[in-house]
Amino acid sequence: FNFPLFFLQSLIKKLIPSNPCVLVDDGKGEPLVLQMNDSAKALGVRKDMPLALVERLGGITILERNKEIEKKEADSLLLWAGKFSPLVVDKFPDGLLVEVKGSLKLFGGQEKLIKKMSDDLDDLGYKFAFATGATPLLAEIGAKKRRKEDVSNRFTSKEINTVPVSMFSFLPKQLELLKKMGVRTLGDYKKLPRKGLAERFGKDALQQFDRLYGYEPDPQ
């Protein structure tokens, strides 16, 4: 499960769509926009916009980031997920991973389990996206790539081939090199010779890639 507005919704869970709302963070030395809802986007608010510019727009609710509250909200969501599986991985601020295979029989199958979890999050007011996958990284990247869909949400190795390399755990310098090489998607990257990949990007990047596709176990 991925929570695209986690920072903002840790302070206001049930956002009113018609009310522009932004969350600012001064971690870079000055207050900058970290997250905003769709109404604020429609007014021209963008990530990393200075607070002074947001204030000039007027009519926007402005909230300051609170890491203590975020920690409490993350802990609460992890505890909630524990109702459905004993295997839950903390991926906040992005979200969480839940190993559901062992819980399917108890909840009547995957569709019913995912629906129950989705209904719970809807009741709590969270905006979220989700995906299932054969590997943890498949599910994680799938949830980031998708908006909330129906329960037919399995993210496959074939689909991951279309994902931009910018969504994988490459460093900025590595992304720049891939761009120069004409590599845009993970499918493009997969076609490159493994020996050359290890030399250019290191064994860690190659190992993560193998875990993504299930070629190597992922001990999360």
Please report, for each region that a protein language model flagged, where it lies by residue:
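Residues that scaffold, gate, or flank divalent-cation-dependent active/transport sites
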Residues: 1-97, 102-104, 109-119, 128, ...
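Short polybasic/polar patches that bind polyanions
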Residues: 41, 56, 122, 179, ...
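Short, well-structured beta-strand/strand-turn elements
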Residues: 60-64, 87-90, 124-129, 184-187, ...
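Short, amphipathic alpha-helical segments
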Residues: 68-71, 75, 107-111, 115, ...
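Short, conserved secondary-structure transition motifs
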Residues: 132-146
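Compact, charge-rich alpha-helical regulatory domains located at protein termini
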Residues: 144-219
